[in-house]
Amino acid sequence: MFEDYKYLIEIYVKLLLVVKKTITEYNRVTSICKDLFLKKLVDYGSAWRILRLSSLTDQIFIKAQRIRGLQQNKTQKINESQSDEFIGIINYSVMALIQIQEGVSEIPDFNTNKCSELYDIMINNTKELMMNKNHDYGEAWRDMRVSSLTDLILQKLLRVKQIEDNSGNTIVSEGIDANYSDIINYAIFALIHMDLK
């Protein structure tokens, strides 16, 4: 009987360590992404606030296509790495989630503090989703290749484009915001695999 409890305790401790590792890695990646987001905010202000969702989707799609091209061709003429593009995917997806919540603006209307606060809210919501899915799927993403994560991002983007073309309506599928959240998580998983520092 004691051996059974000991075994269960060992499994529980291992699971806690894996969860702690995932949260640490996740926070490290999102900290790097937010740092770049805020630096660009200083340079450009919140000009992105005028972008409609379809424009953000297209920007993310271009970045995902470029990553796939780099993975297949290994030749590049622009000095930006896959990591740079994944960070861009994360930040544009956060912008999209903010636009869904706050609506599109006609002018750059957010200051740095407001953007930082909203960024944290979106990332925290997305992290909570990741933790729930990790609970159900057992961190299956750790066994996936970066190229597979790229393909999943592209698939989600094609779904988002279709939903946008349907005026945001779905019959049985999750909405645009859920797809953007998944895209963020897939990109973060890719950066964890690539050991972003």
Model feature map: region roles:
Residues 5-197:
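Intrinsically disordered, low-complexity regulatory regions
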